[in-house]
Amino acid sequence: MTFCYPCRAFALLTRGFTSFMSGWPRIYYKLLNLPLSILVKSKSIPADPAPELGLDTSRPIMYVLPYNSKADLLTLRAQCLAHDLPDPLEPLEIDGTLLPRYVFIHGGPRVFTYYTPKEESIKLFHDYLDLHRSNPNLDVQMVPVSVMFGRAPGREKGEVNPPLRMLNGVQKFFAVLWLGRDSFVRFSPSVSLRRMADEHGTDKTIAQKLARVARMHFARQRLAAVGPRLPARQDLFNKLLASRAIAKAVEDEARSKKISHEKAQQNAIALMEEIAANFSYEMIRLTDRILGFTWNRLYQGINVHNAERVRQLAHDGHELVYVPCHRSHMDYLLLSYVLYHQGLVPPHIAAGINLNFWPAGPIFRRLGAFFIRRTFKGNKLYSTVFREYLGELFSRGYSVEYFVEGGRSRTGRLLDPKTGTLSMTIQAMLRGGTRPITLIPIYIGYEHVMEVGTYAKELRGATKEKESLPQMLRGLSKLRNLGQGYVNFGEPMPLMTYLNQHVPDWRESIDPIEAVRPAWLTPTVNNIAADLMVRINNAGAANAMNLCCTALLASRQRSLTREQLTEQLNCYLDLMRNVPYSTDSTVPSASASELIDHALQMNKFEVEKDTIGDIIILPREQAVLMTYYRNNIAHMLVLPSLMAAIVTQHRHISRDVLMEHVNVLYPMLKAELFLRWDRDELPDVIDALANEMQRQGLITLQDDELHINPAHSRTLQLLAAGARETLQRYAITFWLLSANPSINRGTLEKESRTVAQRLSVLHGINAPEFFDKAVFSSLVLTLRDEGYISDSGDAEPAETMKVYQLLAELITSDVRLTIESATQGEG
């Protein structure tokens, strides 16, 4: 690489000085560091560079920066010292040779130009490579680092983005003064100079080539952090109006409504005003300060996992589409905050039009929100304007975020996906864009959701309250201790790769002018949406609250002694750690006792003390609300819970029969909870879970049979209770189908809900989703897909009765009698 000496002290080093930090350079850096230590409060990306990037501090490390800046160098030094990384101002001694530990790619502009020893800089880097030639055991880790003061993308003025943002001394002074507390030190994965020397040699031409690659690396990194320049809003509207699709829609609007062309065009502009974001970097900065202050007081921590894979995709030039689950209105702010602090551009966010009220609407708009109506039906002009606006965001290179569920989950489970915006995303690809679009599934989890009380009321029939300023203020006034927050980035889905695999001829449908809907679009979008939901659940996060709620709700009296709760949490934790749900899911590293202590601090549970010990109680009024948190991780425990239910009921059962039972019920569970395994993967998963349950002492294995272990029967029963309500719901629907094979789909869903509500009252089932309309609708669709209901709508009575009998064995006799008597009473 082409490098320059950071200062003349390094020239003195090579002439025999034993310490760099002596004399004038030492005084200079100390004087410069004094104001920087006051003005600059930088953040490291990633948060803990050494472990997250796999840096080996026992091996030599040198830093590469994009351009000569002492302020950048000292900012880097502060982060290195804070994270136990080598001090960049301390030279490296290798085989008796002293070399500076940092190198600048570019000399950078100056107020007063002076000679920069470019050739000596190239020689310096060449010396690093040459040392690897003479010492085969040497392996220096070269770590590219960029330091950014502020991340304003600027406005479009016709010029292209500069490859590097180089500032002279005066400009840097004002940047530090104004943006010192909005600065980031971005560490990139290291490059092995040993590998470079072995594979490419050590001559000066290699250094020059590496310099070009490094310049490209830093330019891409800046684009990933800052994003493309922002257009003037009116210029964007003019471009949209000039598009053929909107021009045609305007003509159709004028003709169909018998209005003038000018009036139809004004209608289109009004829709653009309603939809379009008005992104403001200053609003991002201000909100970041406010949220940073707020999060630190409300949350005990925001846990982020797998962000590096997203940073790499942004660096590689992918068009990123963030697809998170939707738990709360807080999701909008939390995800943008996390992305900003991961060195990525906050995305343009598709927000429901219900949030476009004063003052939230204008604020959200400046934070990147663009607003979407609940339905596009019957308004061709609106759908065309929205689709063209979304396509324009993609073509300009802005990252986008939308909630594929279409709304917030009221139950804590993932909702069935709404595919409209996803379909438009693929249509944008069919316009022939050059940048690859990649979908990023994201799991967002909380230990406290501020709307959870409202959700419970809505599930019990209350009318949804319209979003407004008073409602927002009431919600904010209730914010107290929110515990931990979780943002887990799931496995990315590159759309081009997906289409190449599943629709090899998709490029034949590319039309740069018109939005097309080829025959393969709808089924492909449905499959992609289902896959996204699975990937979101794959990134699930277990935490103290959802684990404790799962255990306490499994108890008939919603109470356990502290010892029992500890034992149950250990069961869950060991299952999740030793047989992970997926490589992207996360499990707390804390002990069960520590998790219980943390959960008790959330003030959701009561503790009764007696002479024997503590009893932890989930109050009845809290029980309904706590099902929300249990449901967040239901998918991670449902398979071991089902196995435990089967073993508990049969007392002992062979692996083959257990496998048969699971195989019958699994398709319904997979569809309802978006489980990750295909049927052919089940035997290996069940074997792994059975072995883990044996290791825990929950069961014993004898002659290929699973036997209940009486010594740990309570723990096994509590584990089994995790599937109890799901099995009861299935039993209701299968009994109704068996009793009336010709029942139509609508009636089946309605009667299933009626019986479920009756069961809920008679048997004290507190879960609102137990009789949720969407859950039964999804179940009936799955029964049709699995062949239990024929194309004509009639059930297969022999098959449905067989499944009902299997389910009847897994539910209690009193619940079974309630189900059967309810339908007989109707007859």
From Swiss-Prot:
- Pfam families registered for this protein in UniProt: Acyltransferase, GPAT_C
One GO cellular component term of this record is: plasma membrane
Keywords assigned by UniProt, alphabetized? Acyltransferase, Cell inner membrane, Cell membrane, Lipid biosynthesis, Lipid metabolism, Membrane, Phospholipid biosynthesis, Phospholipid metabolism, Transferase
State the disulfide connectivity: none
InterPro entries the record matches: GPAT/DHAPAT (IPR022284), GPAT/DHAPAT_C (IPR045520), GPAT/DHAPAT_LPLAT (IPR041728), GPAT_PlsB (IPR028354), Plipid/glycerol_acylTrfase (IPR002123)
Pathway listed? Phospholipid metabolism; CDP-diacylglycerol biosynthesis; CDP-diacylglycerol from sn-glycerol 3-phosphate: step 1/3
Q: How does it sit in the membrane?
A: Peripheral membrane protein
**CDD domains assigned:** LPLAT_DHAPAT-like (cd07993)
**What Enzyme Commission number(s) appear in the record?**
2.3.1.15
Asked if the Swiss-Prot or TrEMBL record annotates the protein with the keyword Membrane, the reply is: yes
Q: Tell me the GO molecular function terms.
A: glycerol-3-phosphate O-acyltransferase activity
Enzyme class, first EC level, given as a word:
transferase
For this UniProt entry, which segments traverse the membrane?
none
> Where does the UniProt annotation locate this protein?
Cell inner membrane
GO BP terms in the entry:
CDP-diacylglycerol biosynthetic process; fatty acid metabolic process
Task: Enumerate the catalysed reactions.
Answer: sn-glycerol 3-phosphate + an acyl-CoA = a 1-acyl-sn-glycero-3-phosphate + CoA
Q: Where is this motif: HXXXXD motif?
A: 325-330
- What does the entry's free-text domain comment contain? The HXXXXD motif is essential for acyltransferase activity and may constitute the binding site for the phosphate moiety of the glycerol-3-phosphate.
> Which NCBIfam families does its entry note?
plsB, PRK04974.1
Family of the protein in this entry: Belongs to the GPAT/DAPAT family.
Protein name stated in the entry? Glycerol-3-phosphate acyltransferase
The organism is: Escherichia coli O1:K1 / APEC
